[in-house]
Design a protein with these regions (language model features):
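Helical hairpin unit composed of two closely spaced alpha helices linked by a short loop
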Residues: 74-117, 122
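A glycine-centered beta-loop-beta connector
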Residues: 47, 70-73, 78-95, 133, ...
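The conserved cystathionine-beta-synthase
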Residues: 56-74, 100, 119-147, 158-166
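Generic structural signal for well-ordered, non-membrane alpha-helical segments
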Residues: 2-6, 10, 37-40, 59-63, ...
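Short gly/pro-enriched beta-turn/loop segments at secondary-structure junctions
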Residues: 10, 39-42, 49-52, 65, ...
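Short alpha-helices
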Residues: 1-23
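Internal, active-site/partner-interface "lid" segment
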Residues: 19-49
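Bateman (tandem CBS) regulatory domains
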Residues: 40-54, 106-118
Length: 166
C-alpha cells in the first residue's frame, strides 16, 4: 500500500543520510541516552565508580589493614598494587577462606590471587563487561577498571543492571 511504500522510502532516506554523515552507534548513544539502544551502548567509563571508591592496598600491607579497606569500601574485594600503581592482584572472600589459618600474620601480597584475571578498560561497552562477568570461568560480580595497567575505577554488576544494560 502507499503507506507502506512511504515508510520504506522514509527509512531508506534516513539510512542514506546517516551513512553520508558518518553517524556511528556512539553518536546514537549521545543523542538518545535514555532509550534501550542508548543504554546498550553505554561504556564501562559511564557507569564505573571512580578512584576515590577504589579498594586498593600495596603488596606489603598487613592483612589486618587490607581487611579494614575491604570492609570500609564495601565491594567484597581489595585490589593489590605495586609501587608504580599497577594492579598486580586481588583479594576476595575466597582468598580469605583459603588463608584463614594465620590470616592476620600475612601481607596482602601473600594472600592475593595474582592477576586479577578479569579487568576491563573504561572504553569497553557495559554490555560486554556484563558478558565477561557472567562467564563461568569464574563468574564475578565486581570488575576493576584499568587503564594502562593502573586501576581507574570499579564496576559492580548492579551498576550495569540499574542502567538498563541487558
Amino acid at each position: 500500500t502507499s503507506t507502506t511504500l512511504q515508510l520504506a522510502i522514509g527509512d531508506a532516506l534516513a539510512v542514506a543520510l546517516l551513512e553520508r554523515r558518518g553517524f556511528k552507534p556512539q553518536d546514537f548513544r549521545v543523542l538518545h541516552p535514555g532509550g534501550k539502544l542508548g543504554a546498550m551502548l553505554r561504556t564501562v567509563g559511564d557507569l564505573m565508580h571512580g578512584a576515590d571508591e577504589l579498594p586498593l592496598v600495596g603488596a606489603a600491607t598487613p592483612m589486618k589493614d587490607a581487611l579494614l579497606v575491604m570492609t570500609e569500601k564495601r565491594w567484597g574485594i581489595v585490589g593489590v598494587t605495586d609501587q608504580a600503581g599497577r594492579l598486580t592482584g586481588a583479594i576476595t572472600d575466597g582468598d580469605l577462606r583459603r588463608h584463614i589459618e594465620g590470616l592476620l600474620t600475612h601481607t596482602a601480597g601473600e594472600v592475593m590471587t595474582p592477576g586479577p584475571k578479569k579487568t576491563v578498560p573504561p572504553t569497553m561497552l557495559a554490555s560486554e563487561a556484563l558478558a565477561l562477568m557472567s562467564d563461568p570461568a569464574p563468574a564475578v560480580t565486581v570488575l576493576f577498571v584499568v587503564d594502562a595497567g593502573r586501576p581507574v575505577g570499579i564496576l559492580h554488576v548492579h551498576d550495569i543492571l540499574r542502567a538498563g544494560v541487558m
